[in-house]
UniProtKB/Swiss-Prot annotation:
Name of the top EC class for this enzyme: transferase
Organism: Syntrophus aciditrophicus (strain SB)
Gene Ontology terms: cellular component: cytoplasm
Binding site for Mg(2+): 51, 90, 122
Protein name: 3-methyl-2-oxobutanoate hydroxymethyltransferase
Cofactor remark: Binds 1 Mg(2+) ion per subunit.
Length: 272
């Protein structure tokens, strides 16, 4: 939560209200209890249990191998650490594409079994019926348009989306369709900033940008990226607020040295 919203439970109505008041929304990914607790404590409004965990936690090359069991496991951990923040869980690849019924059933598991408050799924008009059925069933939904990582093979890599007139128009239409289907928010990833601004102005629901400029109603980053923990690849849109990899290396090197030379444990860290 921000200073204004810190200490109160974040709900879909709070998130919608923040757009109306012009208050920016903060979202970061979280994959475990410890990180979720820290982010919740300092005031992040929304914690996204992203399928990005496949890359930054499990070491895969993409999000595609991530399973429902993976996502449920990590969502449970994050939910236990979130006292006030809203927990949003990604529906992984092939958990919602085959049928509306399967999509709703899998989405419901995140709320029922893992303590999530909402789910996020990628796509536009092709998932509109699933979004509608989820919301009718009482499952809050966050949409995801632009660069949708689960479709990276179709896009031919991680590329900016919506650069041409036709592509931009389709994303704008999809955003409206997802809103009308019942989503309470939508993530816009890797789209030109002017397009994201137009979509933000056109929608009643909040937009959360990642590589979509400052005009969105909120921003999201992968926490491992912004803290400098994940070093395999850093997207252009990531600002590193820390470089914890160096801190971790330094601490572990000192530990190794002290164990090797016998200075750890000393009397202060021993039972006498």
């Amino acid at each position: 939560m921000s200073t204004q919203s810190k200490g109160r439970k974040i709900t879909t109505s709070v998130i919608r209200g923040m757009k109306k008041k012009g208050e920016k929304i903060t979202m970061l990914t979280a994959y475990d209890y410890a990180m979720a607790s820290l982010l919740d404590e300092v005031g992040v409004e929304m914690l996204l249990v992203g399928d990005s965990l496949g890359m930054v936690v499990l070491g895969y090359e993409s999000t595609l191998p991530v399973t429902m069991n993976d996502m449920l496991h990590h969502t449970r951990a994050v939910s236990r650490g979130a006292n006030n923040a809203m927990v949003v869980a990604d529906l992984p690849f092939m958990s919602y594409q085959c049928s509306v019924e399967e999509a709703v059933r899998n989405a419901g598991r995140f709320l029922q079994e893992a303590g999530a408050h909402a789910v996020k799924l990628e796509g536009g008009r092709e998932i509109a019926e699933s979004v509608k059925r989820m919301t009718v069933s009482g499952i809050p939904v966050v949409g995801h348009l632009g660069l949708t990582p689960q479709s990276v093979q179709q896009f031919g890599g991680f590329k900016v989306q919506g650069k041409g007139d036709a592509a931009a128009q389709r994303i704008m239409e999809d955003a409206k369709i997802i809103e009308e289907a019942g989503a309470f928010s939508v993530v816009l990833e890797c789209v030109p900033a002017p397009l994201a601004q137009r979509i933000t102005d056109d929608l009643a629901i909040p937009t959360i940008g990642i590589g979509a400029g400052a005009g969105c109603d909120g921003q999201v980053l992968v926490v491992n990226d912004m803290l400098g923990i994940y070093e395999r690849f850093t997207p252009k849109f990531v600002k590193k607020y820390a470089n914890l990899s160096d801190n971790i290396r330094g601490a572990v090197k000192q530990y190794i040295e002290e164990v090797k030379n016998g200075t750890f444990p000393d009397q202060d860290h021993s039972f006498l």
